[in-house]
Amino acid sequence: MKKILKIIGITLLSIIGVLLIGLLILALYSPGKLEPLKDKDGVEIKGSISEKNFIEIGGMQQGFFIRTENPENPVILFLHGGPGSPELPMFYPFETSERLEKYFTVCYWDQRGAGMSYNRSIDPSTMTVVQMVEDTRQMTEYLKRRFNKEKIYLMGHSWGTYLGIKTIEKYPDNYTAFIGIGQISNQLESEKIAYKYMLQYAIETNDKRAVKKLER
């Protein structure tokens, strides 16, 4: 009897394991669907867009989200930080009815090698600023065509501000304006300033352990 129960248990666990693997595969490869944009009363906004999509950029499939209450709005291409750190999921807890998507059509693009645009077969030699600038241009051209815009806005955060600056430097005619959040200007100098601040703070608070580590 114990042997039979053991066999049944192993069989059930195997079935559950296969089902979980199947669900994981579906989650990874399904085009998926975002929650629709809703007004303050929880009613879906008519004509709004909330989608997850993929197009070929720079010779590979790259993923992005587009969200807007009105497709006629000006378009923003958001460049996340990292490199390699898509940020849309972090925005959800802070979303209000006065969200950016009320006034703009926002494209949250997962850059080459990040999030939905990750692929283990990516050639490491393509992971360059030059290629990512070209990817940004192609993503921009897609948005201009789709929403019938001559120019769009470019917004970057952290690493995305560097990518954004390099992009508008090369393709200024594509953009109405650039918005930098946590703008990178001189990374080495920024790190020197941060180091001096941390060391001074550790000394003032008599944190000998931190001082020892920082002075190595």
Regions inferred by a protein language model and the residue ranges of each:
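Short beta-strand element of the alpha/beta-hydrolase
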Residues: 73-82
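Glycine-rich "HGGG/HGxG" loop immediately N-terminal to the catalytic nucleophile
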Residues: 88, 111-127, 189
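Short amphipathic alpha-helix adjacent to the substrate-entry channel of hydrolases
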Residues: 90-107
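Conserved acidic catalytic loop of the alpha/beta-hydrolase fold
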Residues: 131-151
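Gly/Ala-rich beta-loop-alpha elbow adjacent to hydrolase catalytic centers
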Residues: 156-160, 164
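A catalytic-pocket lid/entrance helix-loop region that shapes and gates access to the active site
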Residues: 164, 173-216
